[in-house]
From Swiss-Prot:
One of its GO terms (biological process) is proteolysis. InterPro entries: AB_hydrolase_1, AB_hydrolase_fold, Peptidase_S33, Pro_iminopeptidase. PANTHER family: PROLINE IMINOPEPTIDASE. Its EC number is 3.4.11.5. The keyword Hydrolase applies. The keyword Protease applies. It comes from Leptolyngbya boryana. The active site is at S110, D266, H294. Keywords: Aminopeptidase, Cytoplasm, Hydrolase, Protease. This is Probable proline iminopeptidase. Signal peptide: none annotated. NCBIfam families: pro_imino_pep_1. The lineage of its organism: Bacteria, Bacillati, Cyanobacteriota, Cyanophyceae, Leptolyngbyales. It catalyses: Release of N-terminal proline from a peptide.
Length: 321
């Protein structure tokens, strides 16, 4: 099993204005002359953490992390205005141009895989390779599975806590019920809903429930952005034109070397989506981790991701891995 690379600090960081309203935090670490890779975090609304730098050999990669609109250190915090998938795709291009990078590798898991696909299908000429994990295509059935009826059969205990802020008469549409509370002007209503929404995902993200992950997801500031922005995207169906847009447009990226890492027992983003993506991208490499759930910190997923980044960085730019 592979282990994380040693912890490193960024060699440069900054705030990049991307609209009159939004400014995003970004950072660079590793080798300034290495192969560039942009890390797209999950959620949406999850933000970046220092550990994400450690999935890449710092002597060979130029590692770019940034907080998407409303998340992490980006401002304004938890802002829903001017916050859509296509705003984020535009921000990625603005960041690439700001850093004078012609083409780069794209790494993303969960919602980060959604955004990676949306970005690469919009700008395929800018992508050298894709490393995707815990595939989320933001189709209606995926949303219903996790937030309405499906994952609840596997985690009925945690599901009860998720239900608590919503009265029984509103539970036929949990996304809408949560959205009303997460956009409430009442801070207490908003906070209660944000924590319940966020902790539900934190509880279900690993094959073996991790209490430390639950406490992270219960943090007030994290939960506020995470829950509000997620629910905003999901009630708007990801701002996609069709339910399976990301699968329909796979022909645009069929030539891009792609690795898909998927936990067999991922409850948050079930393997059916990774399987559908792999079939739509038959040249992709699908790695199924047999003893893992959703989290990129689970040993088998972590090992497969680091192995993939090592293989990518060792190959010539246009070569398959």
């Amino acid at each position: 099993m592979r282990q994380l690379y040693p912890a490193i600090a960024p060699y440069q960081s900054g705030m990049l204005p991307v609209s009159a309203l939004h400014t995003i935090y970004y950072e660079q670490s590793g080798n300034p002359n290495g192969k560039p890779v942009v890390f797209l975090h999950g959620g949406p609304g999850g933000g970046t953490i220092p550990t994400y730098r450690q999935y890449f050999d710092p002597s060979k990669w130029r590692i770019i992390l940034f907080d998407q609109r409303g998340a992490g250190k980006s401002t304004p915090h938890a802002e829903l205005r001017e916050n859509t998938t296509w705003d984020l795709v535009s921000d990625i291009e603005k960041l690439r141009s700001h850093l004078n990078i012609d083409r780069w590798f794209v790494f993303g898991g969960s919602w980060g895989s959604t955004l990676s696909l949306a970005y690469s299908q919009t700008h395929p000429d800018r992508c050298l390779g894709l490393i995707l994990r815990g595939i989320f295509l933001l189709r209606r059935k995926e949303i219903l599975w996790f937030y309405q009826d499906g994952a609840s059969w596997i985690f009925p205990d945690a599901w009860e806590h998720y239900l608590e802020p919503i009265p029984p008469e509103e539970r036929d549409d949990m996304i809408s019920a949560y959205y009303r509370r997460l956009t409430s002007k009442d801070a207490e209503i908003r906070s209660t809903a944000a924590k319940a929404w966020s902790v539900w995902e934190g509880t279900t993200s690993r094959l073996i429930v991790d209490p430390s992950l639950q406490s992270k997801f219960a943090d007030d500031e994290f939960a506020d952005a995470f829950a509000r922005i997620e629910c905003h995207y999901f009630i708007n169906r990801g701002f996609f034109e069709t339910d399976d847009q990301l699968l329909q447009n796979c022909d645009r990226i069929a030539h891009i070397p792609t690795v898909i890492v998927q936990g067999r027992y991922d409850v948050v983003c079930p393997m059916t989506s990774a399987w559908a993506l792999h079939k739509a991208l038959p040249e992709s490499e699908l790695i199924v981790v047999p003893d893992a759930g959703h989290s990129m910190m689970e040993a088998g997923i972590l090992s497969a991701l680091i192995d993939a980044t090592d293989r990518f960085v060792a190959q010539k730019t246009n070569g398959k891995i």
